[in-house]
A protein has these predicted regions:
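HIT superfamily nucleotide-processing domains
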Residues: 2-146
Length: 146
């Protein structure tokens, strides 16, 4: 079981992705953050945004890392709505086990939304029926890395 507290986690899957030890489908990257396609296949276009500095969650994260993470969430969300045909996004985050956090590295989920997308009524939290398209196809549509 990985250490769930503090600022170091040698076994952190997201730290391994940042270091290039594990593959990812990058959507956006800068000096402080990385965003990439979620491999869960729960809904098309599901993107994760993480700080490159390891922190457990919002409760553990320093202000600068959190600010950079939120800045990237905004950039990616704007890209999805302005360039990829989505009407809006849901931004989801869980902090600690009781809230459903399963990977103990701060991460924000961006779920692209369209009217009548079948993920729930307008104003409701989305339900995730499963992805319709292959992740590679969606990745080509949403990536900001050229």
């Amino acid at each position: 079981v990985p250490e769930r507290h503090g600022n170091k986690m040698d076994n952190c899957i997201f730290c391994k992705i940042i270091k290039g030890e594990l593959p990812s489908r990058k959507v956006y990257e800068d000096e402080y953050t990385l965003s990439f396609m979620d491999i869960a296949k729960d809904v098309d276009g599901h993107i994760l945004v993480i700080p490159k500095e390891h922190c457990k969650n919002i409760l553990d994260c320093n202000y600068e890392a959190l600010r950079h993470t939120i800045d990237t969430v905004k950039k990616v969300s704007n890209h999805l709505t302005e360039n990829c045909g989505y009407d809006g996004v849901d931004v989801l985050n869980a902090n600690d086990e009781s809230a459903g956090q399963t990977v103990y590295h701060l991460h924000m989920h961006i779920i692209p939304r369209r009217y009548n997308d079948g993920l729930g009524e307008v104003g409701e939290w989305p339900s995730f029926p499963g992805a319709k398209y292959e992740i590679e196809e969606i990745h080509k549509q949403v990536t900001m890395i050229k």
